[in-house]
Amino acid sequence: MSWLVGALQTFGSLADVAGTVSNIVYQQRQAAQLEKQNELMETWMNKQEALQKSQMELTRDLSINGPAARVQSALDAGFDEVSARRIAGSGERVIWGNLDRPIMHAGTMDSIRQTKHLDSLSHSLATFKNGTPFGKPAPPTTKFGKPQATTAQINIGHNPGSSSV
């Protein structure tokens, strides 16, 4: 019976040793997984830092060169200089006659400039407002400002000749 108890104790001790070895192997695998996770996290953080630096450089570049790039892009797309600046956000207005000109493509601008339709409309509106210059007297000239004092002028040394008629 003691032989059987000794064998059972040996098997129990071997089972305990196997459990301990298994636990050590598991802990080593867990440590390896944590190490791999830390390496991945470090790589990810380095990439995030590089992306943030790149984003800051891009934001800085766009804040400095962005408006010029937008204007150049609009010019390359065929807009005239004023329309390109307006597309880029300049806020300037272009008034022809009594009309506020919208943003137009350069081809549209050329056709308007060649036909002079906008100029003729502006002149006709001015005619309705001011009338025609035909048959009207010239408007009086008005001079504004401080009056200039003049001094008397004496003609010295000029003796007109005499005539006998």
From Swiss-Prot:
One of its GO terms (cellular component) is viral capsid, decoration. Keywords: Capsid decoration protein, Capsid protein, Host cytoplasm, Virion. The keyword Translocase does not apply. It is found in: Virion; Host cytoplasm. Its main location: virion. It holds the Pfam family Calici_MSP. It comes from the Viruses. Homooligomer. The portal-like structure consists in 12 copies of VP2. Interacts with capsid protein VP1. Translated by a ribosomal termination-reinitiation process from the bicistronic mRNA coding for VP1 and VP2. Minor structural protein that forms a portal-like structure at a unique three-fold axis of symmetry, following binding to the host receptor. The channel formed by VP2 may allow the delivery of the viral genome through the host endosomal membrane. The N-terminus domain points away from the virion surface. Belongs to the sapovirus VP2 family. This is Minor capsid protein VP2. It comes from Sapporo virus (strain Human/United Kingdom/Manchester/1993) (Hu/SV/Man/1993/UK).
